[in-house]
Amino acid sequence: MRLSGARFALLHGSRATGRARPDSDIDVAAWWSGLAPASFEVDLPAGVDLVVLNGAPLELAGRIAVHGQLLYDDDPPCRVRWVATTRKIYFDEQPRMLRAQREFAEALRRGR
């Protein structure tokens, strides 16, 4: 990822939270300055899944900003800005996201 220009990377998912099983993949998230590649364009070993943070949905990016573990950081001011901004928006929007999830689950339960 570094060779492709990622400024920082975070471990997330089950390996970051300590709930990994032996067959769990490795979930990594990275941020690029400028034009970010698609996740499939970055050459990674088998078993490593990449989230490109530049375009990640808020629910996913927010969980990564809150629970991710830093793997490397070539641009600390950029990382701090991304984490702070993403966490703020995530926590501000969390009540709306939870309400939407409840309404969706209720609609499924009612068969609509």
How does the language model describe each region?
Residues 27-29:
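Short, well-ordered beta-strand segments
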Residues 1-8, 16-22, 31-112:
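Catalytic core of pol beta-like nucleotidyltransferases
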